[in-house]
Amino acid sequence: RQVQGGTHTIQVPIMPQGDWTLSSGSVVVLGPTDDGLPHSAGGNITIPANAKLVLQDTSLMIPEGANLTVQSYGDFEGEHSQLHGNVISHSDQFGDSPSSNLTVDGNVFWTSCQNDMMLYNLHVEGAIQLDNSCKVTINSGGTPSSWTIGVGAVFEIVNRLDVTVLDKGEPVQGATISVDGQSVVTDSGGMASKSVTALSIDSSGVTTTGLMQVQMSWGQITDLMGWDTSMSKQHTFVASTVQSGILTDWLELEKAWSPYPVSY
């Protein structure tokens, strides 16, 4: 047990046999097992106020009929990890870390919502349910299999396109990236980003964005791609150029950066 800033970080070599309630003020980290198999809980898991459970590069299984419950001011995060089971969340801290990346192979129910909730990289493979007035936004999330939305509740998935533009492997600053008519410009690193609301669900219905056309323009060079907004995406545009004129030395054109439009 280690003391870190007033909280306790606990290494748990063996999962409890039955229901497991974390101690308030503790941080429990479950990392990869020696044999690579998932951690297996013996019953319900409860994360009380001021406690935190983190999965790091691992999987956690809870029994059928059991739940992982995140109480108000409790926190549950996953870093490239999976939970096999259902989640009941009363907390706006669940999945709120930008470094979180968690797949829930089960259902998620948000209830007792006191604040709007912003989550990151949460992929729910089962159903979601939002209690009345709950507002949940997932940045870079996956579409759930089904949903139940209470009165005044809103569920949104905001996905992001990260684009890099390269000229013979070097970043291109000032290239225009247009997504459905809205434009951003690449920075000194040749990068630009655009976020869109891919899915919005409220008590009145569902709105999806679907496939969007993305255009890159730089000087005389243009290129197109399609973006399925149901998932975040990274893409590299190659905008290699060859200056017109008389060559006085060898010019090596690498296949990796083709084609090479001649600029005038």
Locations of the language-model features?
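The right-handed parallel beta-helix/beta-solenoid scaffold, focusing on the short coil/turn
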Residues: 6-12, 18, 24-26, 31, ...
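A short, solvent-exposed loop/turn motif at the edges and junctions
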Residues: 61, 122, 200-250
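A short, amphipathic beta-strand motif
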Residues: 161-167, 261-264
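Short, ordered, surface-exposed loop/turn motifs in non-cytosolic proteins
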Residues: 168-183, 187-188
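Short, acidic Ser/Thr/Gly-rich low-complexity loop/linker segments typical of extracellular
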Residues: 181-209
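Compositionally biased low-complexity segments at domain edges in trafficked proteins
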Residues: 244-264
